[in-house]
Curated annotation (Swiss-Prot):
The gene is ripA. Residues 310-321 have a biased composition (Basic and acidic residues). This is Ras-interacting protein RIP3. The keyword Calcium does not apply. Residues 621-631 have a biased composition (Gly residues). Belongs to the SIN1 family. It comes from Dictyostelium discoideum (Social amoeba).
Length: 838
């Protein structure tokens, strides 16, 4: 061979393979295939290298390691080339060797597992065989007894039978548990005429059957019996037509019976020995290749009596019967196995049911634990101890309305202002002075998101529930102001906005003050319905409230606290009402109804008389030099005190839309008020003047007493020049210079009307967008002219922190509380001014 190897393992494998091929092709005399075993192509074979075609030579010696490369591989003269295996091939061969080792290990493990199973099966088979042997012995004993009885009764009839003389077993190797190969040879000799003529008729039959290890012993015994019986029957059938049966000369009847018994005993002993040998061979393990087991039988033909023939027939029948119980036993075993499997399945089902029940119990326990934890974590009621004001029993107490009355009322105050009473232990607690000597300071509890108007409503409700009187139930009739610990109003702070949240002032002491803008005419009809004051005492309540309003303004200047004082007119009115009540009790019911109607008619008349004494008449305004007319209508009513030297307060709206309140005397003129207001705010007196809310200009020589508490508006003659310095070239092409000098007059009703403006919004980095901005009393809307949605379509007025004009004409900016600011450009400068004023 021309190939040399370096690895010893590869050489061993090649030797093993060459031996296999050598054995397979030995008889065919194909030496060329042995030479071409290395899978070399014909082109790679060296034709100069001779090789021997003798079959007796071992060609595995041609493969030698590298160390002996100098020697010739064959008897030829030329030396083959040294072809070494590459490292990659070595790695592949090593990997293949490792894989083969792993496969061998797995096969060994499987074989061990199978051997264990076979041992268990063999043990079971041994137990079954022992039981069968015991049963067979019992049956044999019974059969022997019956045979002895029958032998005496039956007549002698000559027959021929075969007896197994020798049984030789040659176990060369361990047989497989599933296959047994037996070759049975039987020779029979038949007697003719009077003498015993032995004719050697050898019949060789090879019976190959594949059975399990559990039935090896039984099959061998059955084969011996069946072969013997068939040979005997065959010989008798052939001899019957030719020769009649003759009795043997030298054998007597009792000797035949004893000989048959001896042969049966010998057969049984041989069978037992064979079974024991087979069991021993199955237990012993060997790695040598398996070989078959050959069993030979020899037989002689003798004449027997009819009794012995019948006995042999019966024994064969018994053996057949013994085989039948074996099949029935196998069926019983299968049934038992099925029952066991069913029992196992039932046990598994029971276990599963038990597991399910346990899981359900665990789930129930977990649910119970969760319920207990939830019950333990439920909130505990916190009882807050609050101070309760003492009720004045001299005054009549009206019970609070029931839930039914609240539901029946279509316009209930609670429905309007919402439920502002917080649950126990939550919300805010405020200290509010009512100005009523009987009530004093109240501790009012409201929710955190309550507004000022809702807080006033809660204060009036608490005052009414505690039995207090003297306050109007309508929360719009009052304002809240900041005060000190003694209840004195702090003049540095204006009245709080009704729409603001109360949380901003939760740490302050507040005072309930009358609202000068509250219209008593419109609310007079609701005073008798809302409760808190009886209908007959409506005049008292109105008069007392009017006195409180006037006295509160006086006490604000003197800082003497918020304590109402009754004037002489009010005392007279109270005396008149008391007299009317006494008369109403004595008069019949008809007179009472008439008096009530008269009182209702007098109620608005008295209010008008009080207001008309301090109110500015239209003729007086028209007679002034300020340029008025007879169409003046005062928008708000203000009550003033009747004292001769009592100071008064007037509300003034400044040009920057801010509101201030200024104290004045009755004898002060309007021009003096203008001078003091402008000096305080560093404004030019010549560029400003006062107007009323309806836009009428007031004369400077008009005394303040004749205003009647009307609100004033401070208007600038040149508002744009003061806010921005504009040159004539800065005016827009569409507008004119007259827009800069045009005066703008606004009042609340006009400012609250919804109006839209077309503007251009300038973004942060330069791009512009067309927008339509709408303004009303509460909000600012942001719309697109292309009917597309905007990011924020509306925002509230109260969220605006600042509005101002820019240096460029027509530009203005809006800043919000969240820190965002936007720049807009109007079409004209006047529209920008109108937007800011609105």
């Amino acid at each position: 061979m021309s190939v040399y190897c370096e690895l010893v393992d590869v050489v061993q494998q090649i030797r093993y393979k060459t031996q296999i091929f050598y054995e397979t092709f030995k008889r065919d005399s194909i030496a060329e295939q042995i030479y071409n075993f290395s899978n070399e192509s014909t082109s790679e074979i060296d034709p100069d290298i001779p090789f021997s075609k003798s079959l007796d030579k071992d060609y595995s010696l041609l493969y030698r390691p590298v160390s002996t490369s100098n020697n010739n591989a064959t008897s030829g003269n030329s030396t083959p080339p040294n072809n070494a295996i590459s490292p990659n091939q070595q790695q592949q061969q090593q990997q293949q060797a490792q894989q083969q080792q792993q496969q061998q290990q797995q096969q060994q493990q499987q074989q061990q597992h199978q051997q264990q199973q076979q041992q268990q099966q063999q043990q079971q088979q041994q137990q079954q065989q022992q039981q069968q042997q015991q049963q067979a012995q019992q049956q044999q004993q019974q059969a022997q007894q019956q045979a002895q009885v029958q032998a005496q009764q039956q007549q002698q009839k000559p027959t021929t039978a075969t007896t197994a003389s020798t049984v030789t077993t040659t176990p060369q190797q361990q047989p497989s548990p599933n296959n047994t190969t037996s070759s049975c040879t039987s020779s029979s000799s038949g007697s003719s005429s009077g003498t015993t003529n032995t004719t050697s008729n050898t019949t060789t039959s090879t019976n190959t059957s594949t059975v399990t290890s559990a039935t090896n012993s039984s099959t061998i015994s059955s084969l011996t019996s069946t072969n013997a019986s068939t040979s005997s029957a065959y010989s008798t059938d052939q001899q019957k037509p030719n020769q009649p049966p003759q009795q043997p000369q030298n054998i007597s009847q009792p000797q035949n019976i004893s000989q048959q018994q001896n042969t049966n005993n010998v057969q049984q002993n041989n069978q037992q020995q064979q079974q024991q040998q087979q069991q021993q061979q199955q237990q012993q393990t060997s790695t040598s290749p398996k070989k078959c087991k050959i069993v030979t039988f020899t037989g002689t033909s003798v004449k027997l009596n009819s009794k012995t023939l019948q006995k042999s027939d019966k024994t064969s029948e018994k053996e057949n019967k013994q085989q039948q119980p074996d099949s029935s036993k196998t069926q019983q075993q299968q049934q038992a196995q099925q029952q066991q499997s069913q029992q196992q399945q039932q046990a598994q089902q029971q276990q599963q049911q038990q597991q399910q029940q346990q899981q359900q119990q665990q789930q129930q326990q977990q649910q119970q634990q969760q319920q207990q934890q939830q019950q333990q974590q439920q909130p505990v009621f916190i009882f807050v101890k609050e101070k309760v004001n003492k009720v004045n029993h001299d005054l009549p107490i009206t019970p609070p309305p029931s839930l039914l009355t609240r539901l029946v009322k279509p316009n209930s105050e609670e429905a309007e202002y919402g439920d502002i009473v917080p649950p126990p232990g939550m919300g805010l607690t405020l200290s509010i002075h009512t100005g009523n000597t009987g009530a004093g300071q109240l501790k009012v509890r409201v929710i955190e998101k309550a507004t000022i108007i809702q807080t006033i409503f809660a204060t009036l409700k608490l005052h009414h529930n505690n039995g207090g009187t003297g306050l109007i139930p309508d929360p719009k009739a009052y304002n809240l102001r900041i005060a000190d610990s003694n209840g004195r109003i702090d003049q540095d702070f204006p009245p709080l906005d009704p729409n603001q949240y109360i949380t901003k002032f939760k740490d302050e002491v507040l005072v309930l003050c009358p609202n000068p803008k509250f219209d008593l005419k419109k609310s007079s009809s609701s005073l008798s319905i809302s409760g808190g004051v009886p209908q007959q005492n409506n005049n008292n309540s109105v008069n007392s409230n009017s006195s409180n309003n006037s006295n509160s303004s006086n006490n604000n200047m003197k800082s003497s606290g918020f304590q109402p004082q009754q004037s002489q007119q009010q005392q007279q009115q109270t005396q008149q009402t008391q007299q009317t009540q006494q008369q109403a009790q004595q008069a019949p019911q008809q007179q009472q109804s008439q008096q009530q109607q008269q009182q209702q008619q007098q109620h608005p008349q008295q209010i008008q008389q009080q207001l008309s004494s301090n109110q500015l008449q239209p003729d007086q305004v028209g007679g002034g030099g300020g340029g008025g007319g007879g169409n003046f209508h005062r928008t708000h009513h203000r009550n003033v005190s009747s004292g001769p030297d009592a100071p008064l307060v007037v509300k003034i709206t400044l040009p920057d839309s801010s509101i201030t309140k200024v104290v004045f005397q009755k004898t002060m003129l309007l021009k003096d008020l203008l001078e003091s207001t402008c000096k305080k705010r560093k404004l030019l007196i010549s560029d400003h003047y006062f107007t009323l809310e309806n836009g009428q200009t007031c004369n400077g020589t008009l005394p303040m007493e004749k205003l009647g508490g009307a609100d004033l508006i401070l208007v600038s003659r040149r508002p744009i020049e003061q806010m921005t310095a504009l040159s004539p070239t800065d005016t827009d092409s569409t507008g004119s210079s007259s827009d800069l000098q045009q005066d703008i007059f606004w009042y609340d009703a006009l400012a609250w009307q919804y109006k839209t403006y077309e503007v251009t919004k300038t973004k942060k980095y330069g791009p512009k967008q067309d927008r339509i901005i709408g303004i009303d009393r509460e909000r600012v809307t942001n719309m697109s002219p292309k009917d597309t949605e905007t990011k924020r379509p509306a925002r509230l007025i109260k969220d605006i922190s600042k509005v101002a004009l820019l240096e460029k004409p027509k530009y203005f900016t809006i800043e919000y509380n969240d820190g965002k600011s936007y720049i807009y450009e109007a079409k004209t400068t006047s529209l920008a001014n109108n937007y800011l004023c609105k």
